[in-house]
């Protein structure tokens, strides 16, 4: 049972990296076309729940890692990641030079930093966000207390150790993905 909880946490962590992170924008066409059976009602990746919402978010946002065709993990917005010997700390090193554009009305490109990921995870655990994905990260340090409103979001076990270095702290040992 403990192994399944560990496996579930790792799978959720990887899925959320994809769903929660910001997109790296490049030059080129400003149009995007895809087929869905209904119009997405929500483009917020932290609360997207319908199939059309999720498909849209998967096509709009990039993650720290991605799955390759053979099912293994490869860096996407990170250069690499490390897992501590006790498997309680996951450290991701972001690629340098990643940017995002906030909105059509503000064409400024902003640098993507570890603080952006920290903000996303902290927001996911705010009681008012009602993110269905928060439960998938229950192994993060202080996650239950933050979700219950007993501790501030800043107490969550996600930190920006450096501008391009993101650290996740876990309460349980996690089996490293293979």
Where on the chain are the PLM-derived regions?
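C-terminal motif of bacterial Sec signal peptides marking the signal peptidase cleavage site
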Residues: 23-24
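Short, ordered beta-strand-loop transition motifs
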Residues: 28, 82-88, 158-165
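Short, well-ordered beta-strand elements
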Residues: 30-41, 89-92, 117-120, 166-167
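N-terminal lobe/hinge region of extracytoplasmic solute-binding protein
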Residues: 35-85, 122, 129
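Aromatic- and charge-enriched surface segment that lines or borders ligand/interaction sites
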Residues: 79-133
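Surface-exposed binding/hinge segments that line
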Residues: 115-118, 123-175
């Amino acid at each position: 049972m403990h192994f399944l909880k560990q496996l579930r946490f790792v799978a959720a962590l990887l899925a959320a990296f994809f769903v929660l992170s910001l997109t790296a924008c490049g030059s080129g066409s400003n149009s995007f076309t895809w087929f869905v059976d209904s119009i997405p009602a929500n483009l917020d990746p932290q609360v997207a729940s319908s199939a059309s919402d999720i498909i849209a978010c998967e096509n709009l946002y990039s993650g720290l890692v991605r799955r390759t065709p053979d099912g293994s993990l490869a860096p996407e917005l990170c250069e690499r990641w490390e897992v501590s010997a006790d498997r309680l700390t996951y450290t991701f090193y972001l690629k340098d030079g990643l940017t995002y554009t906030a909105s059509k009305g503000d064409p400024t490109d902003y640098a993507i930093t570890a603080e952006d990921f920290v903000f996303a995870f902290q927001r996911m655990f705010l009681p008012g966000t009602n993110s269905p994905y928060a439960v998938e990260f229950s192994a993060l340090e202080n996650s239950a207390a933050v979700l219950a409103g007993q501790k501030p979001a800043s107490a969550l076990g996600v930190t920006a150790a450096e501008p391009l270095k993101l650290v996740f702290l876990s309460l349980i040992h996690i089996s490293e993905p293979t």
